A protein has these predicted regions:
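Short, T/G/N/S-enriched strand-turn elements that build extracellular solenoid repeat scaffolds
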Residues: 173-178, 183-245
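Short, structured beta-strand segments at or near domain termini in extracellular proteins/domains
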Residues: 159-161
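Feature responds to low-complexity, polar/acidic, surface-exposed segments characteristic
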Residues: 1-7, 15, 20-93, 99-129, ...
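Short His/Asp/Glu-rich catalytic/ion-coordination signatures at enzyme active sites or charged loops
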Residues: 138
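Flexible glycan-contacting loops in extracellular carbohydrate-active proteins
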Residues: 132
């Protein structure tokens, strides 16, 4: 992998425990990501512990991802429409949807005109269209050769790159000090005061969140254990999203 264009990002994802080797201690950065691998990594990001019903997913007996798929169902990343697809390479457009489900980036009525520059985006509809527009508008996805390449399989390197463009640090809320270049995914209870942030996500481990004089573009709460959320002071949060599951 040395010298690969995404080497730094892949190493960081490995260090953060999000990306594992693909066998024989190799990262296989140019290999495609399967749906099972994608949701497994996103569940690691969100610290999902709950498990949903996977009976409709047609998971092969003994599949390595059985428990991870159950977590993904619980977190709202998978449903019966994904039946029989978990071992298949995930397309870029379907990956866009997963990133949106995990990070809640698309607004109800996003600016779809940002997709006009990509001729292959005309076939996008519904959630894939909204997710793609949100990722493009935020500068997370830019496409290649003038296209979004929506039907091409997403590689491991591309997955990690999108992930770290969305959020460049995955740390405990207690260790968070303020603004970073991208967003931040925080775990555990939080008591933040007087900090400026771009976008922040509280993962599923947060129970109590207190934000005092906090300024942020977006705050998203993904916790299913939340008992209290207090926002006060003179800060400004442009968008607050409560998405427990």
């Amino acid at each position: 992998m040395k010298g690969h264009w995404a080497e730094k990002t892949l190493n960081q994802a490995y260090s953060d425990g999000i990306l594992k080797g693909s066998g024989s201690k190799t990262m296989s950065p140019n290999s495609s990501v399967t749906t099972a691998q994608a949701v497994t990594m996103l569940c690691r990001v969100l610290h999902v512990t709950g498990q949903g019903d996977t009976s409709s997913l047609q998971i092969p007996q003994g599949a390595w991802y059985t428990q991870d798929a159950a977590k993904a169902v619980y977190a709202g990343l998978l449903d019966n429409r994904d039946a029989g697809q978990l071992d298949q390479s995930i397309s870029r457009k379907d990956a866009f949807i997963l990133f949106d489900k995990a990070f809640q980036i698309a607004e109800a009525q996003p600016d779809l005109t940002v997709l006009d520059q990509f001729p292959d985006a005309t076939s996008l509809t519904g959630q894939s269209q909204r997710a793609a527009a949100a990722l493009v508008e935020a500068g997370i996805v830019s496409g290649s050769d003038g296209k979004l390449q929506i039907d091409r399989p997403l590689t491991r390197a591309e997955f990690a790159t999108i992930l770290y463009r969305l959020a460049d640090q995955y740390i405990s809320a207690a260790a968070f000090t303020g603004h970073t270049g991208a967003g931040s995914v925080l775990s555990g209870d939080a008591d933040l005061s007087g900090v400026q942030m771009g976008t922040i996500w509280f993962d599923q481990s947060a129970s109590n969140i207190r934000l005092t004089d906090v300024t942020a573009k977006q705050v998203t709460v993904r916790s299913d254990q939340l008992t209290s959320l207090a926002i006060s002071g003179t800060g400004e949060i442009s968008r607050l999203v409560l998405a427990a599951r």
